[in-house]
């Protein structure tokens, strides 16, 4: 188990190849700058388990009978990274980064293992919003995080044996609007989606980093950022398809939006929701994007033309009202969509919340919502 001692992060990061199957249906092999995908192992690994005895999953505290539920009894969650046969999930208020591993349907969910922890200000909607692995993670073991501090929102880099290093600072902090997202879209380019800190005027101000999509090249301590998109409201997520397009979700006072950033940096609005279902995390594929919905308690599947990326039909909903309010989303290597719930702060928590869930791949295309 990893520890944090006197502000220094201890990580145990072992790496290996992950064989990824599937193609179009939200397969993270198409949307990741990692080749092959890394895996993350905690310190002091547990001995191999004996094959489970077939039967029903036992009952008890923090044991969810739903076979799709991977982890239970988490604090409210932030970002989520699928790693093939496991995942990393951030706890927004505690600053912990946890590894979660699925088990067979007859076994109780395993207790998540802490991989790292960073100090955050988790008040309001701030804290540890998102995480991303370095594209050279196999060599350097670095994790990037979007966090709220006592003075600002910022991007930091976490390495074994040292304190987090500031990569991008000065993103405005407010009572609300602190959530942000980070995504490596190439091995040397990170996109940073920032909230408006509850101040819509910051989103259109050239002097503010708030309410923007920012580009950071070769992220390192003291990096500067280039503004790619202005006018972001409450930041949802940014997710790339690994080829030529990046999707952005955000919430405004009048509508929730799904925007498309093309390879030439032009931005178009792909879809809007006047009923404001609470767009949050997203997972992209070459022919669409899955969006976690907080208020609507579902995953929206927006099918896009693989050539033009146009969304022409109303996104369909899956897993509606099954797991409560959803935040983070990530693409699994087998076509599944990993999601993390945010019921402890945004919804009505049940006895197993908050949770990480693997949702089976959707069958068919879009439809009415």
Identify the residue ranges that each predicted region occupies.
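Sequence/structural signature of beta-propeller domains
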Residues: 2-369
């Amino acid at each position: 188990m990893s520890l944090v001692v006197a502000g220094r992060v201890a990580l145990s990061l072992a790496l290996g190849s992950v064989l990824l199957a599937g193609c179009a249906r939200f397969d993270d092999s198409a949307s990741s700058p990692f080749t092959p995908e890394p895996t993350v192992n905690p310190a002091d690994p547990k001995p191999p388990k004996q094959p489970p005895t077939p039967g029903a999953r036992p009952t008890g505290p923090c044991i969810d009978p739903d076979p799709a539920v991977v982890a239970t009894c988490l604090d409210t969650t932030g970002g989520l990274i699928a790693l093939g046969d496991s995942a990393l999930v951030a706890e927004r208020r505690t600053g912990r980064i946890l590894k979660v591993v699925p088990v067979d349907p007859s076994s109780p969910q395993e207790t998540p293992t802490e991989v790292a922890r960073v100090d955050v200000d988790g008040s309001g909607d701030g804290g540890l919003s998102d995480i991303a692995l370095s594209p050279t993670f196999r060599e350097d073991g670095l994790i990037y995080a979007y966090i709220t501090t006592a003075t600002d929102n910022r991007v930091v880099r976490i390495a074994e044996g040292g304190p987090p290093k500031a990569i991008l600072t000065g993103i405005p902090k407010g009572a609300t609007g602190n959530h942000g997202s980070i995504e490596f879209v190439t091995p040397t380019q990170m996109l940073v989606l920032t909230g408006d800190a509850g101040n819509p005027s910051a989103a259109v101000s050239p002097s503010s980093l708030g309410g923007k999509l920012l580009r950071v090249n070769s992220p390192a301590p003291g990096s500067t950022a280039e503004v790619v998109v202005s006018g972001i409201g409450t930041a949802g997520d940014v997710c790339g398809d690994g080829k030529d397009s990046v999707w952005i979700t955000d919430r405004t006072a009048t509508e929730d939006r799904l925007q498309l950033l093309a390879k030439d940096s032009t931005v178009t609005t792909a879809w809007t929701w006047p009923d404001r279902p609470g767009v949050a995390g997203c997972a992209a594929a070459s022919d669409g994007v899955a969006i976690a919905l907080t208020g609507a308690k579902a995953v929206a599947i927006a099918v896009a033309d693989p050539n033009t990326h146009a969304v022409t039909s109303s996104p369909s909903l899956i897993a509606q009202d099954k797991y409560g309010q959803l935040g983070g989303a990530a693409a699994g290597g087998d076509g599944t969509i990993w999601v993390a719930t945010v019921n402890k702060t945004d919804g009505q928590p049940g006895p197993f919340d908050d949770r990480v869930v693997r949702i089976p791949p959707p069958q068919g295309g879009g439809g009415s919502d």
